[in-house]
Amino acid sequence: MSKRSWWAGSRKPPREMLKLSGSDSSQSMNGLEVAPPGLITNFSLATAEQCGQETPLENMLFASFYLLDFILALVGNTLALWLFIRDHKSGTPANVFLMHLAVADLSCVLVLPTRLVYHFSGNHWPFGEIACRLTGFLFYLNMYASIYFLTCISADRFLAIVHPVKSLKLRRPLYAHLACAFLWVVVAVAMAPLLVSPQTVQTNHTVVCLQLYREKASHHALVSLAVAFTFPFITTVTCYLLIIRSLRQGLRVEKRLKTKAVRMIAIVLAIFLVCFVPYHVNRSVYVLHYRSHGASCATQRILALANRITSCLTSLNGALDPIMYFFVAEKFRHALCNLLCGKRLKGPPPSFEGKTNESSLSAKSEL
C-alpha cells in the first residue's frame, strides 16, 4: 500500500473509510486490516502503491519546508498576537480581525511539528488516531478561518474608505467580535466531521494518517469549494476593485494614504494567490479526476504531487500573515521596531485606526 502523505492536499479517493485499529477492523487482506468492502472504492491498493509513493527526497524537502514555516510562523504570530492584545484598548474592527487571524494561524502552527516527524519518519504516523484527526481539523480550521478573516478585513476597508460616514454605526468593535465568533463556530462545525471519521490505515509497521473529506469525490465536495473559498475570494477581490475605483475617481485622500491602501490590496491579494488559489484549483481538478476515473498512473502521480505542493503553500499563510501586519498596520510596525531595536521610529504617532470624518474618508484607519 502507498505511504502517501497525510495532510489534506495529498488525498486519495475516498479511502478514509479504511482504518486499522486492531480488533476494530472487520477484515484482513495482505496484512492490511480494512473496513467492510462496501466502503472501498474501485481504486485498488496495488494501483495506489505503484503510483503514489513519495521518494526520500520529497519527504526531506517537505520536512525542511515545514520546519522553516514553523519557525517563522510561530515567532511572527506569537509576537503579533501579543502586540494586538497589548493594544486591545484601540478597539478597532481591523485590530479585532487581525488578532483573530493571528489566533487562526497559531492553531495550525502548533501542529506543524507532527508533520515534520511524519516526513522525517518516511511517512509513518506515530501519534495515533486522535492526533491524526485533530491535526487535520486544525489544518482546515486555520485555512478557512484565515480566508474569512481576510475577507472581513477587505470588507472593513471597503466600508472605511468608500462609505466612511454611512458605515460608522456598522464598523464597531463589538460587531467585529460577533462576526469573528460566528465565523469560528461555522468553520469549526463544518470541519467537525474530521474529528469523528477514521483517518489512519496501517500496512506492516507503517501507519499512514489520511485527512480526507468523506464527500471528496461527490457533488458535495464541489459545493464545499464554492462556499468555503470561491465566495470569500470573489468578495475580497470585489471590495478591493471598488476601493481602487474610488481612489482613482479623486476621493480626498492623502497620497501617502492612497499608497498604503494600494499596498494593503496588493499584499492581501498576493496571500490569496500564493496560498489559497493554487490549493483550491488543484483540489477541484482532483475531485473531478476521481469522479471520472480511468486516469493513467503518471496522471495520478502528478495530481498527488500537486496536492502536496499546494498544501505546503497553504501552510505558508501562517508565515506570510505577520509580513502583512508589518507592512499594512502602522502601529504594529512601530511597536515591533521599538521592541526589536530599542528605539522609537521617527514620524507621527502610529495608530491602527484614526478618527473617521468626511474630509479624510477614514483612510487613516488600519491601512
Curated annotation (Swiss-Prot):
PROSITE patterns cross-referenced by the UniProt entry: G_PROTEIN_RECEP_F1_1 (PS00237), G_PROTEIN_RECEP_F1_2 (PS50262)
Q: Which GO terms describe its molecular function?
A: chemokine receptor activity; G protein-coupled receptor activity; receptor serine/threonine kinase binding
| CDD domains tied to this protein | 7tmA_GPR17
Q: Which Pfam families match?
A: 7tm_1
Indicate where this protein is primarily found. membrane
The ranges of region (Disordered) come to 1-28
Q: Listed GO cellular component terms?
A: plasma membrane
Q: Which cysteines are joined by disulfide bonds?
A: C132-C209
**GO BP terms in the entry:** G protein-coupled receptor signaling pathway; negative regulation of inflammatory response to antigenic stimulus; oligodendrocyte differentiation
Q: How does it sit in the membrane?
A: Multi-pass membrane protein
Q: Which InterPro entries match?
A: GPCR_Rhodpsn, GPCR_Rhodpsn_7TM
Q: Any ranges marked Cytoplasmic in the topology annotation, and which?
A: 86-92, 155-175, 245-260, 330-367
Tissue specificity field: Expressed in brain, kidney, heart and umbilical vein endothelial cells. Highest level in brain.
Q: Where in the cell is it found?
A: Cell membrane
Ranges in the topological domain labelled Extracellular: 1-64, 114-133, 197-223, 282-308
Q: What does this protein do?
A: Dual specificity receptor for uracil nucleotides and cysteinyl leukotrienes (CysLTs). Signals through G(i) and inhibition of adenylyl cyclase. May mediate brain damage by nucleotides and CysLTs following ischemia.
List the PANTHER family.
G-PROTEIN COUPLED RECEPTOR, URACIL NUCLEOTIDE_CYSTEINYL LEUKOTRIENE RECEPTOR
The family annotation for this protein states:
Belongs to the G-protein coupled receptor 1 family.
Entry protein name: Uracil nucleotide/cysteinyl leukotriene receptor
Q: Which organism is it from?
A: Homo sapiens (Human)
